[in-house]
């Protein structure tokens, strides 16, 4: 069985090793795709997880299938028995005490395999499953880290692709700052002009008021100067008469 496994593995790996003769192992590892595509058969070929069927614990099933068309169903057994008797009769193989020791040891090995082989195989499979689980956990952790790195790289690339928006925002901020400065200076100029206009208006109003007061004083002085003593006496007498007349009218009216 072991020889058949070795031969099948060698036959499987022969084309890959033939093509990889001119390359080093590092190059072969570098050319292998990471988690994508079909796995390469170099530098190590895949080994079968379970062996083929055997009879008598040693003879491959393919040997019997090869002899069945030529010798029939009992042909392999007859051939094996005949060869054994031929080797014994011709003394090609001589039975010695070591032969019985070998038979005893082989029988003991077969008994141990039949008795404890299943439980031992389950124990080995359990250890293998634990190792596979650990390796799978490491693999998933590595894949997660790589995926996180890929997502971060994509996010960074997206930010790089949108960097022109940042320039537009900065350009708009500068334009807004210039507009605010322009508006502030315009408002300041408006206030300065308004204050100056208010000052000129106040000056004009004050000058007009002073001119009016001066005109009134001037007219009053000249009017008073133009009134003679006789006119003043006549005016006073006229006022007294008017007051007396008003007093009589007030006395003549009945009290309500």
Curated annotation (Swiss-Prot):
Main location (coarse class): mitochondrion
Pfam family, one: Mt_ATP-synt_B
Domain of life of the native organism: Eukaryota
Range of the transit peptide: 1-42
Alphabetized Gene3D superfamilies for the sequence: 1.20.5.2210
InterPro entries for this protein: ATP_synth_Bsub_B/MI25, ATP_synth_F0_suB
Keyword Oxidoreductase applies: no
Cellular component annotations (GO), alphabetically ordered: mitochondrial inner membrane; mitochondrion; myelin sheath; proton-transporting ATP synthase complex
Recorded GO MF terms: proton-transporting ATP synthase activity, rotational mechanism
Disulphide connectivity of cysteines: none
Signal peptide residue numbers: none
Keywords associated with the record: Acetylation, CF(0), Hydrogen ion transport, Ion transport, Membrane, Mitochondrion, Mitochondrion inner membrane, Transit peptide, Transport
SUPFAM superfamilies: ATP synthase B chain-like
Subcellular localization: Mitochondrion; Mitochondrion inner membrane
Modified-residue entries (N6-acetyllysine), positions: 139, 154, 162, 221, 225, 233, 244
GO biological process, one term: proton motive force-driven mitochondrial ATP synthesis
Positions of modified residues (N6-succinyllysine): 131
Family designation: Belongs to the eukaryotic ATPase B chain family.
Protein purpose: Subunit b, of the mitochondrial membrane ATP synthase complex (F(1)F(0) ATP synthase or Complex V) that produces ATP from ADP in the presence of a proton gradient across the membrane which is generated by electron transport complexes of the respiratory chain. ATP synthase complex consist of a soluble F(1) head domain - the catalytic core - and a membrane F(1) domain - the membrane proton channel. These two domains are linked by a central stalk rotating inside the F(1) region and a stationary peripheral stalk.
Subunit-structure text: Component of the ATP synthase complex composed at least of ATP5F1A/subunit alpha, ATP5F1B/subunit beta, ATP5MC1/subunit c (homooctomer), MT-ATP6/subunit a, MT-ATP8/subunit 8, ATP5ME/subunit e, ATP5MF/subunit f, ATP5MG/subunit g, ATP5MK/subunit k, ATP5MJ/subunit j, ATP5F1C/subunit gamma, ATP5F1D/subunit delta, ATP5F1E/subunit epsilon, ATP5PF/subunit F6, ATP5PB/subunit b, ATP5PD/subunit d, ATP5PO/subunit OSCP.
Name of this protein: ATP synthase peripheral stalk subunit b, mitochondrial
